[in-house]
Every structure is written in C-alpha cells, then in structure tokens.
Amino acid sequence: MDPNKTLNMTMLCDFYELTMGNGYLDHDMQDRITYFDVFFRSVPDDGGYAIAAGLEQIIDYIQNLHFTDEDIAYLRGRKLFSEAFLDYLKNFHFTGDIWAVPEGTPVFPREPLITVRAPAIQAQLVETYLLLQINHQSLIATKASRICRAAQGRTVLEFGSRRAQGADGAILGARAAYIGGCAGTACTISDELFGVFAGGTMAHSWVQMFDSELDAFRAYCQTYPTNATLLVDTYNSLQSGVPNAIRAFNEVLKPLGITRCGIRFDSGDIAYLTKKARKMLDDAGWTDCKITVSNALDERLIAGLLRQGAQVDSFGVGERLITARSEPVFGGVYKLAAIEDENGNIIPKIKISENVGKITNPHFKKVYRFYSKDTGMAEADYICLHDEDVDDTQPLEICDPDATWKKKVLTNFTARELLVPVFRGGELVYQKPSLDEIRTYCAGQLATLWPEVLRFDYPHNYYVDLSDKLLKIKLDLLNAGGKSQG
C-alpha cells in the first residue's frame, strides 16, 4: 500500500454492511427508514460509569461519506454486487438524522449514546466506523478518568504513544485521555491536531550520551533552564541521580534565580525512592522541585503509591492507559431499534437473547437525566419513547426494568435530555465544542455523580430506568417472540 495515499474511511466497514446493502436494494428496501442505537452493556473494569468520546471524528466521517471510482472498481471485482448497487454507491452520501450525547458525558449501560435515523443502506454502512470511534475513545477517556481520580488532584500526563496499538491508537488515544482528565500528552501530533498540550524532557539515552550523569544534567539545565526536569534513575537514583540533579540545579539554575524544576523516576521502588528524594531535595533547599514518576502505572498502582505516602507531584501513565490494558474492549454495539412503514408509522424492533443482558430496548427513544434540585447531583437516567415528555414539576415514579418491584419516587428534580441533534437531513446542526470545552464539561458532569458511583470497588449501580410505555412495548415484543403486532 502507498503510505502517502489518503484512505477513504467510507470503505472502513465490515464487509457484511455491503452485502446487506446490496440485498436491501435487490429487495427494494433501500429507502426504508430505520432507527439504530449505539450503546454498551457493561462498564470496563467493573466501574460505575463510562465517559462518551469520539463524536467529533464521527461528524467528520459523516460529512465526507462517499465512494471513489477506485472503491467501485474494487467492489465490482469481487463479483458479488449488482451493477444497480454499484451505481447507487457512486452517488452515496448521508441524508439521515443523528442524535448523540455530547462528548465528555458520563454514560451508563444500555442507554443510547447515538441514535441514527436513516434509509436502510445508509444506516447500515456507517455502523463500523461509529462503533470504532465510540468504542476506542470512550474506552480511553474512561480509563483516563479513573487514573486521574486515583491521582487525587495531582497532574497526570499520557505517555503511551510508543505502546499504542497503531498510529490512530496513539493520536486519538491522547485526545480521549485529555477529555478524561489528563493534563497533556507526550504525543506531539496530538498537540498539533487537537491542541492537547505536548510535553516531555529527556530519556535515558540523553544521560548516556554524555561522559557523566552530571554533565548530562548540567547541559539540559543550560538548554532548558525554565523546564528542567531530570531523569535520575539511569544509574543509581539515590547515590548519583538525585545528588547530581541537586548539583546541576545549584550550578546552573540557582545563579539565574530559578527555583522551579523537577526530577523523574521511571523505575524502582517508587514509594521509597520518592520519599527519600523529597527529603534530599528539601534539605538542599529545592522545595519547589517537583517529582514525576512513570513506569507502567494505572489507577490501582497510583492509589497504592499514595496510600504508602509516596511523594509524587505528577504521574506519567503510558501503556496501561493508552491500551486500557486491564480491560481493552469497550463493548459498544449498534442495534436496530425500529423501522418505519410506508405510512411513516414507527414499528419497534427487538433483539431477543437467552442472555438477558443482550436483549435490546426497542423503539425510537430519548434519554433524560434527572438532577436533584437540593444537591445538584444526578439521581437517575430515564429512557422513554421519543414523543414522551417529562414534567419535572410533578413527582415521577421510576422502576428498575430488570426488577420492576424496585421503585423510587423522584421529587424536586430537574430533567435534562442527553441526546442532542447532530445531523438533520444529512446537514450538520451541531456546534462542535473545543477540546478544552469538552474536557471542562466532562469534569463538571463527573462532579454530579455520587461518590458511591465513582468508587473503584463495588460501585453503586446507577439507576437507568425505562418509562412505563417503553417497558410495556418491550414486554409485549418479548411475549410475541420479537414480532411487532399490527
């Protein structure tokens, strides 16, 4: 493959999207209006919440949907597709509607993150790319959020580019990590493309290039006096690394009146080393010197280090963030929820499974989030039919759809719709926020979740309930074996 060739992301689809599309056209179903939902079934790492991310890339993709002459020639060469279908693809573009939760929104299992309303072939062909972006970026944003909360207000930087699973994994992973709370990245191109602050200082190779560790530290301080963070574990952290860093600071920075500087550990017993280093630095008068640590960290290890009293100001987190190593699959799915008949009536559809967790919620839906007026905290999410409204001036009884005897009456609450219009009739109607706005929004929304939902171990199951009307339709479809009545 020519590495300079620009790939057409329209072709980034599972092959069965095309075979189904050809079949829809063959049976004159290409214009049938369909409703698909993107949702996930469980939170990674047995957590209490996830963070939605990836919408900006989906918007760009939808706006650029098309098939090139080369694409058509390739498909013709497969000898599976009719000429009528290939002609259809020549003028292919998206004309449907899309609703989505804003990026940075905390989300929960089985509620729609995206709803697509479009003609059958269009809705089918976008499935793969929508899932790819939502699954990847939501996974990394969620992992970053957990790691940043474990750091208890300390700076977290994303350091994982070299361990990422491909270029997009590094570039978009850094973007998602920033949404989830990371302060910056080591990935330069993510700064160039998205404005994710890129930073870094030195590797062990810098130290090894000089005749001595002290010479390496002096040289770095001379070149970057206002950004001198020295890697102190190339040889012996406490016997040479920290003492040589202090000496370089004294010789180069102190005469310049610079007191802000840093050291970094990338190996060893981090809790022990940082406590010893902090005392050495303070005793030498470098109380403003910051200590950064890296070395295969994640939220569990960071929490453990802080429980042990580690003296750390910032964390560089690499492979276990950028690959979400502990649970590297988000598990989002794209399922048909309804179709329209020739008169425009919405016909609900359901997927039935022996596994109760895989039974889908039918129909064209919307999602509300309820906030307590007393505390400002999120109390529950509520999935209802698209034409149902919630009167938040009246008490509302909600129930667990899997255990309907579990009920709760909400009073004194405000209701907010989570799904917002993104495309109408194929035209973008959504004002894309900046990445900093998304990050700030994410932090604000996380602050509305109770600590019981946020905790790492055995978090509270946040309420995601169905309206009575939606639950009845679901049960009727289940009792009818999935077949819509009428």
Segments (PLM) and residue ranges:
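Buried, small/hydrophobic-residue-enriched core segments of structured protein domains
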Residues: 1-34, 42-44, 80, 86-95, ...
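Short, positively charged
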Residues: 78-86, 166, 394-402
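Short coil/turn segments at secondary-structure boundaries
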Residues: 73-74, 142-146, 160, 454-461
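N-terminal, Lys/Arg-enriched amphipathic/low-complexity engagement segments
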Residues: 34-90, 99
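Gly/Ser/Thr/Ala-enriched C-terminal appendages of enzymes
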Residues: 1-32, 36, 41, 45-47, ...
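Hydrophobic residues within beta-strands of alpha/beta enzymes
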Residues: 199, 263, 291, 313-315
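Residue-level "edge-of-site" marker
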Residues: 204, 294, 318
